[in-house]
């Protein structure tokens, strides 16, 4: 199919030509030139690396919103964890290797949805700013780590959250 097929210039440190088409999407990843650090020499160079695509990011956020966590204020946190952990584990296994900061932003977005759930569930949080609720979630993550992304080290920020 000619609409889908395109030739892309794989820009790197060794090839410095300028072309209009240097990125492409494949299997939910966007391949594009980016700064990379060599493992042994610790030198920075331009490499062609995969990142999670904007299309995939949009779909994942839509899926997270479709869970309607805020309206499930009657549901305990461990039941929510049982519901979403297999999905979070799958996303982390697929996108986590090359997702980088864009995947971390998705996990922070999920933490923000959990904070909105807590605000709806507990009356004491209704007048508090979001960072107080995120600190509470961070304390739960330190104690229990019931969500998969908490278990692998992406715990809620105990301060302000940037999206």
Put a short name on every predicted segment:
Residues 1-163:
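Non-catalytic terminal/accessory segments
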């Amino acid at each position: 199919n000619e609409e889908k097929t395109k030739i892309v210039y794989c820009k790197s440190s060794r090839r410095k030509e300028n072309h209009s088409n240097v990125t492409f999407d494949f299997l939910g990843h966007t391949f594009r030139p980016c700064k990379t650090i060599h493992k042994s020499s610790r030198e920075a160079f331009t490499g062609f690396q995969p990142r999670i695509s904007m299309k995939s990011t949009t779909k994942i956020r839509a899926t997270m919103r479709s869970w309607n966590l805020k309206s499930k204020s009657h549901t305990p946190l461990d039941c929510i964890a049982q519901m979403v952990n297999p999905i979070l584990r799958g996303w982390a296994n697929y996108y986590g290797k090359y997702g980088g900061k864009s995947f971390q932003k998705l996990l922070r977005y999920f933490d923000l949805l959990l904070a909105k759930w807590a605000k709806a569930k507990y009356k004491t949080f209704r007048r508090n700013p979001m960072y107080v609720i995120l600190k509470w979630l961070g304390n739960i993550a330190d104690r229990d780590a019931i969500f998969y992304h908490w278990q692998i080290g992406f715990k809620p920020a105990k301060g302000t959250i940037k999206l």
